Design a protein with these regions (language model features):
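Conserved Radical SAM active-site core
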Residues: 1-4, 17, 35-115, 119-120, ...
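Receiver (REC) domain switch/active-site residues of two-component response regulators
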Residues: 130
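Flexible, glycine-rich phosphate/dinucleotide-binding loops
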Residues: 12, 108, 165
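Glycine-rich nucleotide phosphate-binding loop and flanking beta-alpha elements
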Residues: 75, 139-140
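N-terminal pre-triad scaffold of radical SAM enzymes
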Residues: 2-29
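Short, conserved loop/helix-junction motifs that constitute active-site signature segments
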Residues: 124-127, 150
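P-loop/Walker A phosphate-binding loop and immediately adjacent motor/lid segment at beta-alpha junctions
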Residues: 86-91, 142-173
Length: 173
C-alpha cells in the first residue's frame, strides 16, 4: 500500500486534534473528489514499518484525540489488508484514542458478501473503528454546513453504538 500524506495536528477530519493518514488507491472516482491524485494505487510513498512507527509517535501526545484514515479509499481490499495489522497496533497502544475512517462505500456495501470492498479483513477492521463516515461524495448534495463530511448522503456512523444495538446509530458530537 502507498499513502499520499500523513497530516499531524489535523482538525478537519474528526473531533479534536488528530493524525490523519491519506492512503492511495480508490476505484470509486467520485466526481469533484478533493484528492483525485490519490485514486492511483502507486501514488505517494510506500507504507512501511517506519511509516507505522512515525504515526504511532505522532499519536502519543495526550492532546492528540486519535487517528483518521482516509484517501484514496481505506476500504479497497488491498488497503484493508495492510491497514488491519496497523490499526490493531494503534488500538493496542492507544485504547482511549478514537479511530475514524472515511469511505466512499456505504456501510451496507462493506457488510455485503460478494461486494467489491468486502474481504477477509473487513469485519475485523470495522470492529476496531469508532466512527465510519460512509458514502460517496455527491456534488449535487454538497452541504458545507455539515461537520466532517461534504455531502448530505454521507453518514457519520457511531460503530460502537451500532455494535451494541445491532442497528446503525449515527454519531453526534
Amino acid at each position: 500500500m502507498n499513502y499520499a500524506v500523513i497530516k499531524n495536528c489535523d482538525i478537519a477530519n474528526g473531533p479534536g486534534v488528530r493524525v490523519s493518514l491519506f492512503v492511495s488507491g480508490c476505484t470509486n472516482h467520485c466526481e469533484h473528489c478533493f484528492q483525485p491524485q490519490t485514486w492511483a494505487f502507486d501514488y505517494g510513498e510506500p507504507f512501511t514499518p517506519q511509516t507505522e512507527q512515525t504515526i504511532l509517535e505522532l499519536l502519543s501526545p495526550d492532546y492528540i484525540n486519535g487517528l483518521t484514515l482516509l484517501g484514496g479509499e481505506p476500504f479497497e481490499p488491498e488497503n484493508q489488508r495492510v491497514l488491519l495489522p496497523f490499526v490493531r497496533r494503534v488500538r493496542a497502544a492507544f485504547p482511549r484514542k478514537t479511530i475514524w475512517c472515511f469511505t466512499g462505500f456505504t456501510y451496507d456495501e462493506l457488510l455485503t458478501e460478494g461486494s467489491h470492498p468486502r474481504c477477509e479483513a473487513t469485519d475485523e477492521l470495522l470492529s476496531l473503528l469508532d466512527v465510519l463516515v460512509d458514502g460517496r461524495y455527491v456534488e449535487e448534495l454538497k452541504d458545507i454546513s455539515l461537520r466532517f463530511r461534504g455531502s448530505s448522503n454521507q453518514r457519520l456512523i457511531d460503530l460502537n453504538a451500532t455494535r451494541q444495538t445491532g442497528s446503525v446509530q449515527l454519531f453526534s458530537s
